Regions:
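Structural microenvironment flanking redox-active thiols in thiol-disulfide oxidoreductases
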Residues: 63-106, 114-123
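Boundary at the C-terminal end of the N-terminal hydrophobic targeting segment
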Residues: 17-21
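Short active-site neighborhood of thiol/selenol oxidoreductases, capturing the structured segment around
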Residues: 43-64, 85, 168
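Short, internal strand/loop/helix patches
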Residues: 102-144
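Thiol-/selenol-based redox modules, centered on thioredoxin-like
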Residues: 136-137, 141-197
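Bacterial N-terminal signal peptides
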Residues: 6-16
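A short beta-strand-turn-helix
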Residues: 30-50
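Positively charged n-region of N-terminal signal peptides that target proteins for export
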Residues: 1-4
Length: 197
């Protein structure tokens, strides 16, 4: 994956340091509508593995991942194995119509939940787009962080390691995920400014 821009990487370093939910703890329940108005309650997926992907179509990192079909390929691989994939857009300026257009243009087969107030994003401590969270069948958060190590300057592999893929494979084998938390990279989540800012 090519380096997009130094400004984009700088945005990652300026991400707010919300604590959010802790790995190993219960994933907080929430209800959000998707781009078509269908409401999704996290607890309705209890008994299944859930992937939450914070996204923003205007972010160059997100755009590159969708050009490369990173997320869509993972969804296609695991959807028949009782894995639920939910994108979440916490950008304050996002409109459902924008999401529908983005989904149609990119062939996105899973819903994008609309969180313009940033309530759920802040609850989970989502800092970047993308920022990935994996929840096991018992409702426990087992991973949060980057989709892969493409921007890790210390990696020595020929290609990037996909952390979400590693976590899902381990969960489906009934094993403990080999990685629990990594530093996310991408654009900062464009939260609605607070009244005091």
């Amino acid at each position: 994956m090519r380096i997009l821009c130094s400004a984009g990487l700088a945005l990652m370093l300026l991400a707010p340091a919300w604590a959010g939910v802790q790995v190993g703890g219960p994933a907080p329940d929430f209800t959000l509508p998707d781009e078509n108005g269908t409401r999704h309650k996290l607890s309705q997926y209890r008994g299944r593995i859930v992937v939450l992907e914070w996204t923003n179509p205007q972010c160059p990192f997100v755009q590159e991942h969708y050009q490369n079909k990173t997320m869509i390929r993972l969804y296609e691989r695991y959807r028949s194995q009782d894995v639920v994939w939910l994108a979440v857009n916490s950008s304050h300026f996002n409109k459902p119509a924008d999401t529908r257009r983005w989904a149609q243009e990119n062939g996105i087969p899973y819903p994008t939940l609309q969180d313009p107030e940033g309530t759920v994003g802040r609850l989970y401590g989502a800092q970047t787009t993308p920022h990935m969270f994996v929840i096991d069948r018992n409702g426990t958060l087992v991973y949060r962080g980057a989709i892969d190590n493409a921007y890790d300057p210390d990696r020595d592999q020929a290609g990037p390691v996909n952390y979400v893929e590693q976590v899902l494979d381990a969960l489906l084998r009934g094993e403990r995920p080999p990685v629990r938390e990594t530093k996310p990279y991408g654009c900062t989540v464009k939260y609605k400014p607070s009244a005091t800012s």
